[in-house]
Each structure stands twice: as C-alpha cells, then as structure tokens.
C-alpha cells in the first residue's frame, strides 16, 4: 500500500501504538453509555448523579497544555468536549494520547461530567481507548481543502465525515421516504417488491442495461421501471400497491439524471389520473409538513408553495401560452412544423408529430415551471400505457408534475384494454425497428394479465432523487445520492 508523507507519519504512530501494546483497531471495545447528543441533553441529571459515562467519536480539535489537554469528539449528531490530565489518566496513557493520536482518529473516553470555567460542558477523562487509527488526515476546511464538488462526490465518506450539513441532506432524504411510505401505508396501500432482473424491459421509454444469466443462457435487463409487474399485482386482486426501489436506465448523466436512481411507483385500483393527482398532491404536502412543519419551502431564491390546489394546465394550453402554437389545431407534423416556423421558434426538428410536441414543451415550457404544476393530456404516441381520452383519442389521460423546471412525477389512467395495448406494443415495435432504441418491447405475458381483467387503475411514478432537490435545496441530484455515477478519474 502506497502512503504519502502525511500518511507515513501517521503509520509510524500506529506502529508505536502497537509497540506499546495498544491495538489500533481492537476487536473488543468499551460499551458506549451515551451518544454525544444524549450526554448534552442529559448533562444536568448526569452531573447531579455523579454518573460515569463512556462516549465515542472522532477527534476533531485538540489542545495540549503541558500536563493537560482539551479535545472535541464528533459523532453522527454533534460534538462534545473532553478534558484529560496526566494526573487522572496516568503518565503513559497521557503521553500516548498526546504523542500518538491525530485529528480524525476514533477514540472512546470514560469519565465524569463537569463544566469548565468558560461554561463548556465536558467529560473529565479517567481512561481512553483507541478504536480506529486514521491514516489519512481529515481535510482542513479553513484552508478550503476538499471543497471541489467532484472530489466530494468521489469520496463521499470523507465528505460526510467532514461536513455535518451533508449528513443532514441525507437525513432529510430518509425522512422524505419515510413520510411517503407512512402516507401510503395509512391509506391501505401494500408495499411490495418486484424483479430487478427482467427478461423483458418495459414501463418507460429508456435504454436498458443488459446482463446475462450463465446457467439459464438467458439475456436479462436491469429494470427501467416497476410498472408492468405492479399492474400484474392489481390484476391479482390487490386494491393498492407501491414499491420504492432502484431503476436503471442507460442514459446520460446530468443535473437531473443518474443511470441508477430511486423511484416510488404507486397503483390504485378503481382510480384514475384525477384521483392520482389528489394522492400525489397530498403525499408530497404531507412529507413537507412532517419534515418542516410547513407547506412552504425555500428553494434557490424561490418560495415553493405546496399548500392549496396546485396549478393544472393541459399540454395544449401550456404550449400555446408560451409559444402561440396550438397543437390541437396542428394535428399533423407538417402543419405543426409550419406553425413553429411562423412563430419564429428555433427548435430541433423531430421525426414525428408527437415527438415534436414533446420537444416544444421541453424547450419552451418545462424550464418555466417552478411552482408545482400538473401538465395533463399528452399525445397518445408518447404514452403507450395510458388510456385515451374519450372525447379526443389523439390524447391520453396522463399528467406529469413539474417543479423547479423539471419533471418530478408521471402518472396516468392505466390502459386496461388488452387489444388496444397490443396495438400500442406493435407500434412501439415498429418504432424500435426504425431506430428508436427507447421504444418498448412486446410483453406477451403482460397482455395475458390484462386478458384476465385489470380494474380501472391510476398509476404514479415519482423520482425520489429529484424530489429531494426541493426538500434539501440542492441543484443537482449528485448531491442527494450517496454515491452518484461519475466518469473515471482522468477522463474528460
């Protein structure tokens, strides 16, 4: 193992500890009686009881003053001061602490509690134990070390250790997921698990990751969505199911995309996209109330209001408002492209009417949707798993929720007509043959499930990582994923 000069110095101290009979990574350690937060919260009662406590943490500050020393320990929730004197811990243990410990080491101390002349609650140490000798020193934040975003994401363990505010981001993420789970559980939804390895990928327009099962001699795909398996469970008789889990899409990496990401998908029998809109609004609002005790969240200079009724716009109205192009009047590609030209819009030409509509929306509408907004009534070819609108079959009963200029959720009244679904799959197959590598595959078993009969159903998918941006005031999902996918070091 190669060590730099600083690491070599620390390794020398590790060897000195071993020579003194002190194990730098012991198998048996003292039993912790209190976390640092618990000691601080119970301080007065513990002092009154003259209690002996054992606390543990990482050394963050250290001041040696002759025959005594002050230091701070940090753990998951805070910091606490410790005081050692040669008279109390003994000559050798004190010398070992002074000479052989470094910032970043993890230690345990045992002692009683007191308040310093400066009014700082502290532990008067009677013994200490090395728990883990740190060979790499922690970054010096005062000198701006470890402030590079990519370096922090590559070494998240250092980032978390050095930056309590980063740990708080992931605590909020965990509380968000807990709140969503609670909201659904209280309404009778059943949490389930469906396959990650799938013989046929579907449920979204995306390129999959491919793998191979050696014994079965079978190509498999990492799932791009949980949708089709969850709807099989609705066919099987469950009234409401949901799954929180990882999906995988072989696509680009940017501010709102990571190849591996977390989604929650929810399916409600005897519902539709209108009932799912209400559920979505209620669930996200509930999470905000649980975490912040408020429905108003500050995000990058915007005050995002999750209370009240959220804005609802049809895709036609949203596009017309921003561009003057009326997609209901321009239902063929040529007339749509002509209208785009007449409006003076600079936009990439797409191969089909539906994809051109989607491009119009993505370019001119989506970035402007900062407050929570439901966009409804999508072109049917963009939504092969959604029910057509009864009064206009060129569009479907679908909505997407947008906030912060990005899609947060996608939902529809689920298509339960097996014959219509088969035709949609065939259309997708033709698109795939024509070069669309994000088109869905034919799924014969799913069609068999629909033949058994699926009740009218509303379905929802929410990107947890994107929703976390709002709840943690971050601008890229790499900051709300513990270990985001990054290029190899040295690659451009």
Swiss-Prot record:
Example GO molecular function: ATP binding
Entry cofactors: Mg(2+)
A Pfam short name: tRNA_anti-codon
Binding, Mg(2+) 1: 400, 407
Keywords: Aminoacyl-tRNA synthetase, ATP-binding, Cytoplasm, Ligase, Magnesium, Metal-binding, Nucleotide-binding, Protein biosynthesis
Assembly: Homodimer.
Organism of provenance: Herpetosiphon aurantiacus (strain ATCC 23779 / DSM 785 / 114-95)
EC number assigned by the record: 6.1.1.6
Name under which the protein is recorded: Lysine--tRNA ligase
GO cellular component, one term: cytosol
Source superkingdom: Bacteria
Annotated cofactor note: Binds 3 Mg(2+) ions per subunit.
GO biological process: lysyl-tRNA aminoacylation
């Amino acid at each position: 193992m190669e060590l730099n000069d600083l690491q070599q110095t620390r390794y020398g101290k590790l060897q000195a500890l071993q020579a003194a009979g002190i194990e730098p990574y012991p198998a048996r350690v003292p039993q912790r009686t209190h976390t640092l937060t618990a000691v601080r919260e119970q301080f007065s009662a513990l002092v009154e009881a003259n209690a002996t406590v054992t606390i543990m943490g990482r050394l963050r500050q250290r001041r040696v003053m002759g025959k005594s020393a002050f230091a701070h320990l940090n753990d998951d929730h805070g910091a606490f001061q410790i005081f050692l004197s040669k008279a109390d811990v003994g000559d050798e243990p004190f010398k070992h602490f002074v000479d052989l410990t470094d910032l970043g080491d993890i230690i345990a101390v045992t002692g009683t509690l007191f308040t310093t002349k400066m009014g700082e609650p502290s532990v008067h140490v009677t013994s200490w134990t090395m728990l883990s000798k740190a060979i790499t020193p922690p970054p010096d934040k005062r000198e701006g070390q470890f402030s590079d975003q990519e370096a922090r994401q590559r070494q998240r363990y250092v980032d978390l250790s050095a930056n309590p505010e980063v740990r708080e981001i992931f605590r909020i993420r965990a509380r968000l997921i807990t709140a969503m789970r609670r909201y659904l559980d209280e309404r009778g939804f059943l949490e389930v698990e469906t396959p990650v390895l799938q013989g046929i990928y579907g449920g979204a327009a995306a390129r999959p990751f491919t793998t191979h099962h050696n014994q079965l001699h079978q190509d498999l795909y990492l799932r791009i969505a949980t949708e089709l398996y969850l709807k099989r469970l609705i066919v099987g008789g469950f009234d409401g199911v949901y799954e929180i889990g990882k999906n995988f899409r072989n696509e680009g990496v940017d501010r709102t995309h990571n190849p591996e990401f977390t989604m929650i998908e929810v399916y409600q029998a005897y519902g539709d996209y209108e009932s799912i809109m209400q559920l979505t609004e209620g669930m996200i609002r509930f999470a905000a109330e649980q975490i912040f005790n408020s429905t108003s969240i500050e995000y990058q200079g915007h005050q995002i209001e999750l209370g009240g009724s959220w804005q609802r716009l049809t895709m036609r109205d949203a596009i017309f408002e921003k561009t003057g192009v009326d997609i209901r009047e321009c239902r063929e590609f040529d007339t749509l492209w002509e209208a785009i030209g007449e409006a003076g819009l600079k936009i990439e030409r797409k191969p089909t009417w539906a994809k051109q509509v989607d491009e119009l929306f993505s370019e001119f509408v989506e970035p402007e949707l900062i407050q929570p907004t439901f966009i409804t009534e999508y072109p049917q070819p963009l939504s092969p798993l959604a029910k057509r609108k009864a009064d206009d079959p060129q569009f479907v009963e679908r909505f997407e929720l947008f906030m912060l200029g990005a899609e947060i959720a996608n939902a529809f009244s689920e298509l339960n007509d097996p014959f219509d679904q088969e035709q949609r799959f065939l259309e997708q197959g033709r698109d795939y043959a024509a070069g669309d590598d994000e088109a869905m595959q034919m799924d014969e078993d799913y069609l068999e499930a629909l033949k058994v009969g699926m009740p009218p159903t509303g379905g929802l998918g929410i990107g947890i990582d994107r929703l976390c941006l709002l709840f943690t005031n971050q601008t890229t999902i790499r900051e709300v994923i513990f270990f985001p996918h990054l290029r190899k070091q040295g690659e451009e």
